[in-house]
Amino acid sequence: MMMIAPSKMSAQEDNGFKKFSVEEAFEDNGFQWFRDAQLLCAGNKEKSNAMTIGWGGIGTLWQRPALTVYVAEQRFTQKFMDDSEYFTVMSFDVKDSKVLNYMGTKSGRDGDKAQALGLHTAYTANGTPYYTEATMVIECKIMYAAPFDPQYFKSDVPKNMYGNFTAGVHSMYIGEVVNAWKK
């Protein structure tokens, strides 16, 4: 009798996630999704950082599924984004709003925010960090990164925004969606 060994489950499946295609099964409103706040994480197994984000976009660019995020120059996470090849964006259940609130008001410069919240860090096959408490994880490979250049602002909206914003001009990171999982 021939025995077939069970296939090795991915770390994400071990943590209750199922892989899905953002192009076929992303059910959230792309305009509202970032307004509801998501968690951005970058780094590696030695050191990572996450922050709450409310700006972003999801769609298609260069014939690839793409996700765009923005990080201000004085944010601790920006160095992790600049030094990383991949990043994750995570959704959390509404009842976990303390996670998004804390990650959005505390700096990783002052301590390990994930540890302070009791979050469990796991890693994708690419080594990208995510938290097992998330309800959805989208992993992206950075295709483009650049800071906004104020000389190209064409309306008063960004001019007025940055006139009172102490964290500096944002950098834009466009990532190709390479993996997505949800619970």
Question: Language-model segments: which ranges?
Answer:
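Basic, polyanion-binding surface patches
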Residues: 10-183
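Bacterial Sec-dependent N-terminal signal peptides
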Residues: 1-12
